[in-house]
């Protein structure tokens, strides 16, 4: 029976006693201990004799466990062989505590090192995210006036070009595909915004007056000598300056994208076909007609048109940069000769003296958003003034659209009158003071107090000077994966500019028409002294590339907007911003809704074809003289909300497209 008990205990406990298991699992040998020869295992019967009956109480068992010599932690293993167990003078648990303390110190060092390393890696990754170059091709959008130019901008982004690279290529493309609106012989303005750094730069490459141009010459002969209308082109200098600041791909490669469009040919757009059929310049030369009407009649939309002459010019500029355009080379000589032959006074020195300006945009806060727009001689301050005035009205979804339209019409009358007082601040110091007043919320509240809720003003609140601007303009909007926003508007002034075409294929602008002089218009409106003609001066401009971002932080709505139509464009931008930022409409709906524009010279409120008869009747009941027209302006846009980016064209345009990378 005793043998059976012993066998059952051994099968239950195995080869080791509970004390042996404790010594193996709880107290490993310290690394510095010398290994000792393994001691032979005692017989189970001898241990049981010492421990006594296994059914004894736990306290007795634990006491006996403390008397067990722990072979795995002893340095005198050899002396224990064959010896009976004896009480130890040293508590093995005290030794274990010391050993654990030693191991905890080592663990602390390891954990500290790991945390330090992890923190360093995290900081490096955060810095890379915010300040490093993008590592993958993410979302983006491009919007232009022609589908092939939008596709070209997208292609540049796909080849890891910057947002500005894409904008430059697309703008040059529009100079080929939309020669009635833009080109190398014109000028414009580009607004670039860095989202991560919250920094903005405006590159002004508006045309300037030749040094020998005088107001008297324009008064006598502006309508018979088209050479007098040509300003020094700024397009090449401006795009090159933008690329120097923000470009990623080589300049020559960016220009090669556009040169391929000119060389391979493009499909004539609806807008170009209409311009060639209805808006040919009266002085169109044989060279002009051979270039744009090669078959002797206006081309149909979709017809293939090639411009190998412009492809060659772009190749030259890609190799030599703007020097080939401005520093007395063959291109410069051709432009000067063409202008002088048509009665103009431009010289080679005018080209060498020209420079693009890099400056800060004007800005205002509207409904928690920062609105950025070009400073004078552009009319960005008047746009912000309109928003400041409207901000004080209770414009919500609860207010009827008809009432909101009345407030907008009266507000735009004030804003456009303010715009007519602007000009080039380099030549008139009072313009800076006028700009400050336009940006003031206090002044806006004062103007708002003069607006009746129920009746249109019978006469303008402010003196109105001559307002005439480029009716045609080309737009490029880019939001790229590099977290940059680019908005650009360029122009030749009226369709095909001056109509003067150089042997190299450069179509020259007519921007001197944007200056003000006596008896300039049929209605004999008063000329603006601030916008009078002076050598080297830049005329008043309604080219208004506009960027919107959250006033605080990074999260929220970002917008890039552009418009054509001169003063009508300012009215259109105001209403689109109102729809998006105040009425919380999506961008597509905001661009599609009907728009109005007050013509200050005739005191007529123009509305587009989207207006209903009920809306027109409401406005007429308030005292507005309403005239319905098909289209007032095109406003294109791109919107970014968090990480979602979309590009949207104005639905009134048959040719413009917006493309997005999803």
From Swiss-Prot:
Topology Cytoplasmic: residue spans: 1-106
Transmembrane segments: 107-127
Positions bearing carbohydrate: 198, 267, 283, 330, 353, 394, 519, 523, 586
Keywords carried by this UniProt record: Acyltransferase, Glutathione biosynthesis, Glycoprotein, Hydrolase, Membrane, Phosphoprotein, Signal-anchor, Transferase, Transmembrane, Transmembrane helix, Zymogen
GO biological process: glutathione biosynthetic process; glutathione catabolic process; negative regulation of response to oxidative stress
Topology class, membrane: Single-pass type II membrane protein
Entry EC no(s): 3.4.19.13, 2.3.2.2
Pathway(s) it belongs to: Sulfur metabolism; glutathione metabolism
Modification after translation: Cleaved by autocatalysis into a large and a small subunit and the autocatalytic cleavage is essential to the functional activation of the enzyme.
Quaternary structure and interacting proteins, as annotated: Heterodimer composed of the light and heavy chains. The active site is located in the light chain.
Protein known as: Glutathione hydrolase 7
Organism whose genome encodes this protein: Rattus norvegicus (Rat)
Source lineage: Eukaryota, Metazoa, Chordata, Craniata, Vertebrata
């Amino acid at each position: 029976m005793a043998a059976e008990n012993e066998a059952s205990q051994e099968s239950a406990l195995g080869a080791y006693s509970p004390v042996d298991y404790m010594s193996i699992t709880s107290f490993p040998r310290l690394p510095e201990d010398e290994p000792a020869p393994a001691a032979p295992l005692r017989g189970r019967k001898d241990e049981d004799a010492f421990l006594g009956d296994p059914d004894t109480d736990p306290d007795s068992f634990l006491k006996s466990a403390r008397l067990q010599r722990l072979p795995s932690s002893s340095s005198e293993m050899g002396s224990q062989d064959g010896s009976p167990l004896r009480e130890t003078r040293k508590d093995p648990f005290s030794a274990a505590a010391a050993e654990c303390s030693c191991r905890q110190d080592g663990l602390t060092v390891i954990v500290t090192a790991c945390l330090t390393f992890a923190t360093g890696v995290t900081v490096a990754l955060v810095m890379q995210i915010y300040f490093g170059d993008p590592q993958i091709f993410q979302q983006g959008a491009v919007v232009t006036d022609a589908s092939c130019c939008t596709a070209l901008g997208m292609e540049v982004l796909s080849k890891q070009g910057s947002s500005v690279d894409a904008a430059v290529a697309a703008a040059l493309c529009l100079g080929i595909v939309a020669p009635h609106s833009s080109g190398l012989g014109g000028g414009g303005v580009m607004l670039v915004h860095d989202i991560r750094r919250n920094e903005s730069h405006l590159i002004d490459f508006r045309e300037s007056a030749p040094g020998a141009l005088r107001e008297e010459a324009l008064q006598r002969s502006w309508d018979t000598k088209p050479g007098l209308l040509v300003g020094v082109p700024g397009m090449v200098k401006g795009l090159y300056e933008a690329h120097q600041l923000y470009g990623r791909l080589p300049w020559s490669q960016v220009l090669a994208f556009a040169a391929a469009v000119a060389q391979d040919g493009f499909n004539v757009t609806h807008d170009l076909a209409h311009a060639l059929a209805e808006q040919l310049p009266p002085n169109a030369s044989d060279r002009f007609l051979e270039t744009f009407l090669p078959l002797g009649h206006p081309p149909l939309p979709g017809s293939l048109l090639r411009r190998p002459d412009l492809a060659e010019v772009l190749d030259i500029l890609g190799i030599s940069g703007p020097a080939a355009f401005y520093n007395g080379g063959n291109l410069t000589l051709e432009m000067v000769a063409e202008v002088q032959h048509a009665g103009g006074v431009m010289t080679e020195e005018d080209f060498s003296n020209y420079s693009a300006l890099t400056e800060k945009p004007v800005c205002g806060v509207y409904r928690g958003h920062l609105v950025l727009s070009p400073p004078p001689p552009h009319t960005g301050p008047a746009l912000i003034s309109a928003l400041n005035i409207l901000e004080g009205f209770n414009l919500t979804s609860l207010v009827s659209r008809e009432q909101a339209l009345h407030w907008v019409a009266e507000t735009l009358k004030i804003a456009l009158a303010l715009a007519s007082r602007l000009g080039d601040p380099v030549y008139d110091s009072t313009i800076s003071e006028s700009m400050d007043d336009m940006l003031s919320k206090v002044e806006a509240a004062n103007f708002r107090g003069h607006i009746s809720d129920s009746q249109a003003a019978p006469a303008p609140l402010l003196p109105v000077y001559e307002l005439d601007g480029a009716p045609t303009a080309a737009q490029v909007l880019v939001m790229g994966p590099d977290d940059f926003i680019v908005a650009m508007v360029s122009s030749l002034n009226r369709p095909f500019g001056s109509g003067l075409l150089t042997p190299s294929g450069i179509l020259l602008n007519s921007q001197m028409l944007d200056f003000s002089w006596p008896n300039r218009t049929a209605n004999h409106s008063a000329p603006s002294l601030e916008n009078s003609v002076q050598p080297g001066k830049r005329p008043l401009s309604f080219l208004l590339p506009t960027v919107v971002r959250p006033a605080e932080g990074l999260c929220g709505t970002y917008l890039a907007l552009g418009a054509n139509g001169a003063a009508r464009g300012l009215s259109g931008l105001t209403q689109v911003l109102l729809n998006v930022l105040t009425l919380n409409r999506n961008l597509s709906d905001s661009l599609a809704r009907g728009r109005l524009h007050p013509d200050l010279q005739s005191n007529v409120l123009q509305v587009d074809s989207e207006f209903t008869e009920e809306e027109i009747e409401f406005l007429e009941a308030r005292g507005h003289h309403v005239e319905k027209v098909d289209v007032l302006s095109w406003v294109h846009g791109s919107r970014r909300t968090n990480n979602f980016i979309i590009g949207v064209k104005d639905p009134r345009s048959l040719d413009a497209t917006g493309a997005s990378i999803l």
